[in-house]
């Protein structure tokens, strides 16, 4: 059940409460000073029973508990901080945090309603060894996909050698001939990537999905950390949590490095579909943190295969465009002619080598879910390495012999549209009714290329506040990687998404999911500070609705946000 996001009245006796109250053992410490240790211990046991008494481990890996009553070492300080807090007080603090998010405009659209971004108070924690594995696996994956894109829009060696079938490229709606032969500066097409991971029943990380077009969600990583450092300030110092506030500087450095050659001081802009887009807050936040201009399509003009930005002081040249809209809407001269949110001629300027588009046009061929099934082979082919992170076991209905096997076992598999986003169109066979299974069977039979099938994975669970108790909820992890051409840097932590409804495996916010702050523990002390936003332009004060420029939902919002 989704938590009630209304802000309740303060508990009796409370006169005020800060937006991000520190979780502290106040009542317990007072009792200790009076010497009433027995009362304190009983209060601890009572609070522990109230919050975790109904916590039953599911048939999945639990992030906090190794087994009933046995806490994993990394979580011991967090559990100690939660124990003395009354459940009603914990709920009150969570609602106060939601109210603070609303005041800052950190919201999202769900079922046509604007809601505060749901952040759970229990963090997801990864120790240094776990994170080393994750970041090596994510960086390896990005390098392999980068090599694939260069090959697919160049010599096509992997296709000639039979590693990947030609039909995968030629039948892809994301293959753009305009991008063929275009050599981006530094050879980088994937400047930003979001690689979705899950932890299976054995506790091993597996890759669930690659996002290398317009990966979204990093602003929530930043905002989650800003909130949690105010809730658990002492824990951050005690736990040596690696900070996340270096992302904007890393991204800006990568974008500047991607500028066309011969530009001494490149001008970078963030191109947004506009305030009606569901992730407009993220676009504005990143532009502000990087100290660059946030622009819409009508703010740019192309002339002589160059891009200019209209300003009150006249037109200024633009060298790098970090674009947050889909290929189809980017340039009406090359793609959809009815697009009113793009910039006519910008693709021609990119093809002429006078502006860099980040991420590159045509990257969709690399995060096609059917291509996902070939990535382990691509890692071996291009990098001569074994995959650090395995895939989820997958099947390709478009291959001879696999279609009938998938159709026969459809009630035991997870069926996904290869071009789906935001959890849309996913059918979980073991939980689907007969009518849904039959409809899905016919859809797969009619278009085998449009689907993949996967073995169900019992996503790991994490204690999550449900009402006034903790309950196990399924989670995934989206680490964000930045590629500057010489190194692939992975933001420590990433976005942990949580399915707030009991038993649900769909974690996407567009499907009612929430989030957790992801703590990566350093081996030694990690400097902590909350970065204040700076740079040109205020953040939006009112959260935008997920509507298009004409007041209706448009495809670009799905493509830009649901990744």
Regions inferred by a protein language model and the residue ranges of each:
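Preference for protein termini
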Residues: 1, 8, 17, 27-29, ...
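Residue-identity detector for glycine
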Residues: 13, 35-38
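Compositionally biased, low-complexity intrinsically disordered regions
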Residues: 18-21, 34
């Amino acid at each position: 059940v989704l938590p009630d996001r209304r802000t309740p009245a303060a508990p009796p006796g409370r006169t005020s409460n800060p937006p991000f109250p520190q979780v502290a053992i106040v009542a317990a410490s007072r009792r200790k000073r009076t010497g009433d240790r027995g009362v304190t211990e009983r209060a601890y046991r009572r609070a522990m029973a109230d919050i975790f008494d109904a916590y039953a481990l599911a048939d999945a890996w639990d992030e906090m508990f190794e087994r009933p009553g046995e806490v994993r070492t990394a979580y011991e300080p967090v559990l100690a901080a939660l124990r003395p807090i009354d459940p009603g007080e914990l709920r009150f603090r969570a609602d106060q945090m939601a109210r603070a998010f609303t005041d800052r405009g950190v919201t999202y659209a769900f079922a046509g309603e604007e809601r505060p971004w749901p952040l759970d108070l229990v963090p997801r924690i990864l120790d240094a060894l776990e994170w080393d594995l994750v970041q090596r696996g994510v960086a390896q994956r990005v390098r392999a996909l980068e090599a694939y894109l260069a090959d697919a829009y160049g010599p096509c060696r992997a296709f000639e050698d039979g590693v990947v079938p030609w039909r995968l490229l030629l039948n892809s709606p994301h293959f753009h001939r305009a991008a063929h032969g275009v050599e981006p500066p530094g050879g980088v097409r994937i400047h930003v990537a979001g690689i979705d991971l899950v932890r299976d029943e054995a506790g091993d990380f597996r890759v669930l999905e690659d996002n290398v077009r317009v990966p979204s969600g990093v602003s929530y990583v930043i905002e989650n950390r800003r909130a949690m450092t105010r809730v658990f300030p002492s824990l951050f110092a005690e736990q040596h949590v690696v900070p996340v506030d270096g992302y904007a500087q890393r991204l800006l450095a990568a974008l500047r490095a991607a500028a066309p050659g011969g530009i001494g001081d490149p001008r970078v802009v963030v191109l947004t579909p506009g305030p009606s887009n569901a992730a407009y807050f993220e676009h504005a936040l990143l532009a502000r943190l990087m100290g660059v201009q946030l622009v819409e399509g009508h703010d740019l003009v192309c002339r002589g295969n160059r891009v200019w930005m209209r300003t009150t002081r006249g037109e200024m040249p633009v060298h790098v465009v970090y674009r947050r809209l889909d290929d189809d809407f980017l340039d009406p001269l090359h793609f959809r002619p009815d697009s009113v949110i793009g910039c006519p001629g910008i693709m021609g300027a990119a093809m002429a080598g006078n502006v860099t588009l980040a991420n590159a046009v045509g990257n969709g061929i690399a995060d096609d879910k059917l291509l996902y099934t070939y990535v382990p082979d691509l890692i071996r082919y291009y990098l001569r390495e074994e995959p650090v992170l395995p895939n989820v076991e997958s099947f390709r209905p478009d291959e001879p012999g696999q279609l009938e096997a998938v159709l026969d076992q459809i009630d035991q598999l997870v069926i996904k549209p290869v071009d789906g986003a935001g959890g849309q169109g996913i059918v979980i066979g073991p939980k689907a009714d007969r009518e849904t299974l039959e409809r899905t069977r016919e859809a797969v039979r009619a278009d085998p290329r449009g689907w993949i099938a996967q073995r169900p994975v019992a996503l790991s669970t994490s204690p999550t506040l449900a009402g006034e108790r903790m309950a196990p909820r399924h989670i995934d992890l989206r680490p964000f990687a930045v590629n500057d051409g010489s190194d692939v840097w992975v933001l420590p932590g990433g976005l942990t998404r949580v399915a707030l409804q009991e038993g649900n495996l769909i974690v996407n916010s567009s499907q009612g999911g929430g989030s957790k702050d992801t703590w990566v523990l350093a081996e030694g002390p990690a400097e902590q500070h909350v970065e204040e936003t700076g740079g040109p332009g205020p953040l939006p004060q009112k959260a935008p609705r997920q509507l298009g420029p004409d007041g209706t939902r448009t495809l670009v919002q799905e493509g830009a946000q649901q990744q």
